[in-house]
């Protein structure tokens, strides 16, 4: 006996030693990888310091050679030389990649020399600014960081000329000269404050169906609940109203409805703030009536994101099961009301697509995914796995979805179009003959249901079953004995089926891969309730005098939307992806630029093709009509601005000229009121001015243009707007900017999922702004409607269109309009005034808790974990205090959570591109 114990101890000791050695080897490998990364960062830093030193030497040499009180034209020429080359000398063309410009739509461009990645590059060799930031946080490089800090601070300073004629800001160490207008007598007296106007999310166009599943449900309130970007939308299709839950900080990926049909759980992916720090994935449980957050679950527990989740049914929804997107796809069970994790276990390294509690057996949880279905026995804090036995049946590539029959059997749909019925049986144990092992699930029956995959199963209230097919696009209704009764095919233009849910009466809802939500019956067919773009979205234009907006995207669709009834007026598919657009001043036609250099003119009412032209073979980045509509400027990635004469109300075009002089691709441009001049920006941070009647000549003395009152202001670089740039920006953080027609505010779209509202003009660095979260990807464009009543913003990868209402905050305790600060909950009662020139009625509304006020860049720092957890525990009294109500009505509650994070999509949790919708989806399941 002692010998047996000794041998057992030896084996345990040997196993322990082996485990320690494995762990040591893993640690050594990790240390080596970190050392390699530090080496790369040091090399990048050395290159940055070298470039800064060369630039400083060149500038110093020029200043010594030229008297400071020389002629203005000479000083201006030197300033332009510095801007384009970083030092003295003649202007030389440079590649767009020289400034590491993030160009998310360049995948369609054919040019190699200016191609760039779809996401912002984090390569340490290119992103020198990021390399410096990382090294400043590394203790092992403390000596180097002091030098970097000094150099960085020097180039972030704003320099004013001794004569007060111009001001310089620095972007990635490069000077940008902006001349001060004559009406600014003393720049030191210029003040930039928060604007009194604020934004409130009014409508969201679009639905995320392309790469998600089982994410459409009908609530007892009559609302369809679904998500897109970081917004969960509650849409009442009968009343044409929307409410929004805005508690999430990044992409929402999954949703589960509590058995009471009131409470909802939604899970999101991990995020990254603008400083590169991770924001943790989590699940939020919230009330669909009040839109208040009940719990925030899983902070610090989940990795990468939340893949799927489900409420328990046998115990009336006390528990919540969650599977994350880590390599092990961890299954956790929570008492969500107590926010306590009860059990946790690894599931599999393969993809997991669904998790469900058994509706009658409280101790059983079922998960399925790639080539597996697992039945988990849950008792206390333990989970035991039993694998489903396929036996004589062919094992499918994927088990896609789950449902439960009235007798307790488990129904699963697979990628081969088969419905499998799993029954609990008694199986003889091979270890002990005659013994019984209870609770083993085996296939008792299989039914051929669809051609292609069975993508979704929906158990109806009357016991009937709805199934949705992938390849065949069919919705089939099955009776209690699983015999098919009715079927209907979703038209091809809507894509394949992603979700099916029971609707009112005999209606049902269908979510599709082309981002449609359809409402239909087997007798009457389908009606479109929600639709949106299916690929990255950049092009946006608002009608000059109607409540219409036009969008174009990489999906080749051009869509005209009505901003009043929130409907689609028309859509047209182009031959190429669209990137930019502008309405003719008459509103009769719209010009659309594409990725190949071609541009189209469409009739704004009939969508007929009016004209087609080609300028170069690279992406067109901006289309802009002159004020009188007689000229059209086309900005291209080939560094040129093409000018066209326009006649017959925008129906006839002839080449007028070409502006040549930019050293990088055109990003933005604006016209003067007299149609004589153009101001343009480029990827090399240039601000150039052009005299159009004189043959599109470059104006060398840019001070001549300092007093032009530009008709529009969309250029992101200029004296009136340079204060919008955040500290430490690399010049690519702002994708779009627009000034309101009343010239009071500036709206801005940035790379950190935020929409900002600044005061205009914004001529002081680090200007404060109101900032808003709803997008979950870089915000690509913004535009005010014709009467400044609304702001439209578009998301890139999230493919969403957000419509915000402008509201002016008016304090009853003061005579003037005062912009609220982040501590506005302690201020006097505030009312909201909708900014509509023709309807100045004051409407009391609940205060938007999701509104973020950016006082300093420090406020954009991510809060600690406990701060985000506390966010869920804050009562809705904040709204009550400001609105003067004891409890908000359902239609008045915003349900918007305060959030100071500035986040962008993590590299490992990007919105994936689904395969072609006409392709069979069986081998590429969507989690």
UniProtKB/Swiss-Prot annotation:
Magnesium as UniProt keyword: no
Domain of life: Eukaryota
InterPro entries: Beta-prop_EML-like_2nd (IPR055442), Beta-prop_EML_1st (IPR055439), HELP (IPR005108), Quinoprotein_ADH-like_sf (IPR011047), WD40/YVTN_repeat-like_dom_sf (IPR015943), WD40_repeat_dom_sf (IPR036322), WD40_rpt (IPR001680), WD_repeat_EMAP (IPR050630)
Region annotated Disordered, chain positions: 85-132, 815-927
Biased composition annotated in UniProt, kind: Basic and acidic residues: 116-132
Subcellular localization, as worded in the UniProt entry: Cytoplasm, Cytoskeleton; Cytoplasm, Cytoskeleton, Spindle; Cytoplasm; Cytoplasm, Cytoskeleton, Microtubule organizing center
Annotated spans, Microtubule-binding: 1-189
SMART domains registered for this protein in UniProt: WD40
Residue spans of the WD repeats: 199-237, 241-288, 296-336, 343-378, 385-424, 442-480, 485-521, 524-563, 567-604, 610-646, 653-692, 702-760, 767-806
Gene Ontology, cellular component aspect: cytoplasm; microtubule; microtubule organizing center; midbody; mitotic spindle
Described purpose of this protein according to its UniProt entry: Essential for the formation and stability of microtubules (MTs). Required for the organization of the mitotic spindle and for the proper attachment of kinetochores to MTs. Promotes the recruitment of NUDC to the mitotic spindle for mitotic progression.
Assembly and interaction partners: Homotrimer; self-association is mediated by the N-terminal coiled coil.
Protein name per its UniProtKB record: Echinoderm microtubule-associated protein-like 4
UniProt organism field: Xenopus laevis (African clawed frog)
